[in-house]
Design a protein with these regions (language model features):
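Conserved acidic donor-binding segment of nucleotide-sugar-dependent glycosyltransferases
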Residues: 281-291, 297-304
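Conserved donor-binding/catalytic core segment of Leloir-type glycosyltransferases
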Residues: 161-177, 183-189, 195-197
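Aromatic "clamp/platform" in nucleotide-sugar-dependent glycosyltransferases that forms part
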Residues: 249
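Nucleotide-activated donor-binding/catalytic signature segment of Leloir-type glycosyltransferases, i.e.
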Residues: 208-232
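Membrane-proximal helix-turn-helix segments that form the acceptor-binding/catalytic region
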Residues: 94-112, 213
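Glycosyltransferase donor-sugar binding loop
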Residues: 170, 193-211
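Short hydrophobic beta-strand element within catalytic cores of glycosyltransferases
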Residues: 262, 266-269
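Short alpha-helical donor nucleotide-sugar binding micro-motif in glycosyltransferases
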Residues: 228-229, 236-241
């Protein structure tokens, strides 16, 4: 079997981590090593004579690899212009320039991996002419899987009471994620523990940095913000929890939903059309804080409802498991390599 060389690029390997794009990059690397036997896998290697370069981050570091015309170049579209609003400081001011830059970047690729159908639609509206493939983010779901023993061990390690109902969220602390809704639910349900796994990795470059710092410092007593932590610790928080809740207004995909589902947790999201396409009816949803509160309260008190919700979310884990998604990725790579011969 001929071995092809692939060079996977992400400046998150040596800059800011603790965000979804970095997780997608590391999961892609692991998936290639595990499920792509005809590829020799490298990452961030300058001067490498590769058959394929696959770029995850759209900063200036990726441009030198993007402009390589000696091999196939793929780019994963994790961000669209709307992703920056409510995430980075001053985004509304430089939004038009971001739109021009991203269009230019994606149009230099031989193929663009849109992480959801909504992203694919936005790329078309931006007039991206490169071939667009809807390829979702993936996750090694086995790493997050939980059971009573793992749950007890995680709770002991994290000093969480055995009988406490725990709601977990994961992501950057930023306005777009609707931290305010998370805290409103916690305030209304003081007997339930709420944990936000994540912090502000981009620090003062993040939108509303000072406001978000104040929000964390003045959160109700039943809320914990972990800050940016190691991957192994993130898994422990999922395994110690009872439900996953992300009230975010906008996500290009949201790998954290797969993490929650993989840990066997019911998944609760804000009601929007994007999620209906990506996650079908495999999650619980509400329009507002009142709806979220009612669902969380029911999950904590109704065992039949809880079991039904957990069974629904297990379909998310199965659909977006690394093994499943890598079959699609390998097919795209191999088809385009054959065309290039």
């Amino acid at each position: 079997m001929k071995k092809y060389i692939i060079n996977v690029i992400s400046d998150s390997a040596f800059t800011v981590q603790g965000h979804g794009v970095h997780t997608a990059y590391t999961e892609h690397l692991d998936g290639l090593k595990k499920y792509s036997p005809n590829f020799e896998v490298h990452t961030n290697e300058k001067g490498l004579k590769a058959d394929i370069v696959h770029i995850h981050t759209v900063g200036f570091y990726g441009i030198r690899f993007l402009l390589s015309r000696k091999c196939l170049v793929f780019v994963s579209a994790h961000v669209v212009p709307d992703s920056f609003v409510g995430s980075l400081v001053g985004a509304k001011l430089w939004y038009p320039f971001a739109k021009i830059y991203l269009k230019w970047f994606y149009n230099r690729a031989d193929g663009v991996f849109a992480v959801s159908q909504e992203v694919a639609d936005q790329l078309k509206k931006m007039k991206v002419k490169s071939p667009i493939y809807v390829v979702p983010n993936m996750l090694d779901t086995e790493a997050f899987a939980s059971n009573p023993k793992k749950k007890a061990e995680a709770r002991k390690k994290l000093k969480i009471a055995k009988d406490k109902f725990v709601v977990v969220c994961s992501g950057q602390v930023q306005p777009r994620k609707r931290v305010d809704s998370f805290l409103a639910c916690a305030k209304a349900l003081p007997g339930i523990k709420f944990i936000w796994v994540g912090g502000i990795p981009f620090k003062r470059a993040a939108a509303n940095y000072n406001e978000m710092q104040k929000v964390m410092q003045t959160a109700p007593e039943n809320v914990t913000f972990t800050g940016v932590i190691k991957h192994e610790e993130v898994i422990a928080y999922y395994q110690a929890s009872d439900a996953f809740f992300l009230p975010s207004e906008q996500e290009t995909f949201g790998i954290v939903m797969i993490e929650g589902a993989s840990a066997g947790l019911p998944v609760l999201l804000r009601d929007n059309d994007q999620y209906k396409i990506t996650f079908k009816d495999w999650y619980l949803s509400a329009h507002d804080d009142k709806g979220f509160i009612e669902i969380i309260k029911k999950l904590s008190s109704d065992s039949k409802y809880y079991k039904m919700a957990a069974q629904k979310s297990s379909k998310i884990a199965k659909r977006y498991d690394t093994k499943t998604v890598m079959k699609q990725i390998n097919s795209i790579y191999n088809t385009d390599l054959e065309k290039k011969k």
